[in-house]
């Protein structure tokens, strides 16, 4: 059992949302995936300390993997920006964060480099510094370079594998128990027949082996297997989000991501409204 009690409950449970994108039916069943796979870009293991910012840590790590292996001073991204702006951007107050909110922030704003919004601060103290950074145009313009294109729900282990293989690391959550430990092979274990769960925890899923999913945690390199662990297939994630970067988009004809019905319907409505407006605008110009 882990001696050090890291914060739990930092990943808040979400309800289903009809606006969520998901993978099209049949895409995963037709995909030929290897028995084992690990995403090829390594990023440093972060340490959230006693702050309930696991979602922001996992999200910023995923964005860092999108930068590739290129050496850059701007390669360390902020966790405080994602965690500290959620009150202003999404209306959530209190410790912890939703996966969807972190994805929505990365979709609209990207993420700031660490020096533009430094620190790892718990709410409510993180709000002031993060919101102040958001009001600096030069910082938000730079953050926009790290924006994602889309995110989508992964509703099965097969969909998580497909997302990692085609798009890169997945943002995921699981219920955590303090009875969990990592064995010598790096596999997450518990000796309790019915473990007592103490809250949700977010991690970055970077691949899979024959034993389970390879995950990168945010509790420092001294935890687990150099900061990582394998979640066995007998355990499961509570939710997961695939992340599409601008550099890993597929052609529109081969696009495996399904647009939610609500979004597709609204597009049709907007198209009809625009046609009507343009019709009357054209009639006015011919008079």
Model-based region annotation:
Residues 36-50:
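Asp/Glu-centered strand-loop micro-motifs enriched in Gly/Pro and often flanked by an aromatic residue
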Residues 20, 25, 148, 190, ...:
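Positively charged, low-complexity intrinsically disordered regions
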Residues 85:
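Acidic/histidine-rich, surface-exposed loop or edge segments in extracytoplasmic proteins
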Residues 64-81:
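Phosphate-handling active-site elements
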């Amino acid at each position: 059992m882990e001696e050090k009690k890291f914060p739990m409950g930092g990943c808040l449970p979400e309800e289903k949302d009809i606006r969520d994108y998901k993978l099209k039916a049949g895409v995963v069943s037709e995909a030929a995936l290897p028995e084992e796979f690990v995403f090829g870009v390594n990023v440093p293991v972060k340490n959230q300390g006693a702050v309930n910012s696991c979602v922001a840590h996992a999200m910023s790590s995923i964005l860092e993997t999108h930068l590739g292996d290129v050496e850059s001073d701007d390669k360390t991204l902020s966790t405080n920006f994602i965690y500290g702006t959620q009150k202003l951007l999404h209306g959530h107050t209190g410790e912890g964060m939703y996966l969807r909110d972190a994805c929505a922030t990365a979709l609209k704003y990207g993420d700031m480099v660490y020096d533009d919004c430094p620190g790892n601060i718990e709410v409510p103290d993180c709000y002031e510094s993060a919101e102040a950074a958001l009001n600096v145009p030069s910082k938000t313009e730079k953050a926009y370079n790290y924006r994602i294109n889309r995110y989508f729900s992964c509703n099965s282990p097969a969909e998580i594998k497909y997302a990692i293989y085609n798009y890169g690391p997945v943002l995921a959550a699981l219920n955590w128990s303090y009875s969990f430990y990592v064995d010598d092979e790096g596999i997450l274990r518990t000796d309790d027949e019915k473990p007592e769960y103490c809250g949700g925890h977010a991690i970055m899923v970077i691949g899979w082996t024959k034993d389970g999913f390879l995950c990168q945690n945010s509790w420092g390199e001294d935890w687990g297997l150099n900061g990582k662990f394998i979640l066995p297939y007998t355990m499961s994630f509570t939710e997961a989000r695939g992340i599409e970067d601008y550099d890993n988009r597929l052609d529109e004809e081969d696009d495996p991501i399904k647009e939610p019905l609500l979004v597709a319907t609204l597009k049709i409505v907007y198209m009809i409204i625009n046609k009507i407006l343009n019709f009357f605008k054209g009639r006015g110009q011919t008079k």
